[in-house]
Amino acid sequence: MAIAFRASGPIDTVTANLGLLAELPGTFIGSGFNLISRPAKQHNKPFFLELNATHEILQFMAIGGDIPNRGSGQNDINLHGVRYLQQVSDCVEHSQIHIEPGLWLHVPETSDPQAGESYVRQALIPHGDSVLAQSTFFTTVNGGPQIAPVASTPFTGQIPDLNTPPATPITDPAYLAPFTDTPLPTECLPQGLNAAQTIKNPALVLQAAIAGQNIIKTDVISISSAPAGGIVNIPFVVQNANASRIDAIFWIETVRRPNGQAFIQLQYVQRVILDFIGIHWPHISVATLVKQ
């Protein structure tokens, strides 16, 4: 029996169609920080604040050809993209805390619907969650990234954008105490971080990681599940800690060493909103990864 395969195009042709994803194929390794408030009914508490210094391996592989989407209101389009596997472990205990396969896609401009070029991230989370997030902003800038604060304070009411503080933060001292009293992990984080300030704004870990670097170019992709897409969860997750929204910014940086050589570095900040006991709880992850 004959088996037909779709042949991959030349690598320069494949990467030329990836847009801002072109530098991703390969393996990125580095470290980061994870903050999550999770339910703790089993221990007779409303929640538990968990902090992890992390070690991460993020592997990207280019999809070797066109991904045709057939049109009925306009001509067909071709998507292009990369598949990825993200593996995150606790840097102190060396236990795995996250694994995520997924896709990044580069979508061309369309007329039906009328929409500009965009990027899409699809992810599978082994807690029973499927994610679809689309770009809200992307650009290329000279120099390094502008990393704005990302608030970890739990809140009620409307979910703000990633870099906007919540309008109605929780003020109960019993709920806020872990966000000021919990020590940071003792290993794998940049030196000199203030614990309370870092818990309040985990993006400080990203700023500390690139202090003193000569970043000459940065590709920026901001994504969210809010405008289009979303998160689909199994019923247990919906009832106990519903993942309702994801927002993230990825910075793909070209860094120049003092000897003139350059390397590629990936930084990201991601916020997933978990909803339980009537409160929105930001689950924030950051990392700085170097392409191998």
Q: What residues fall within each predicted segment?
A:
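Soluble ligand-binding/transfer domains with enclosed cavities or grooves
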Residues: 2-292
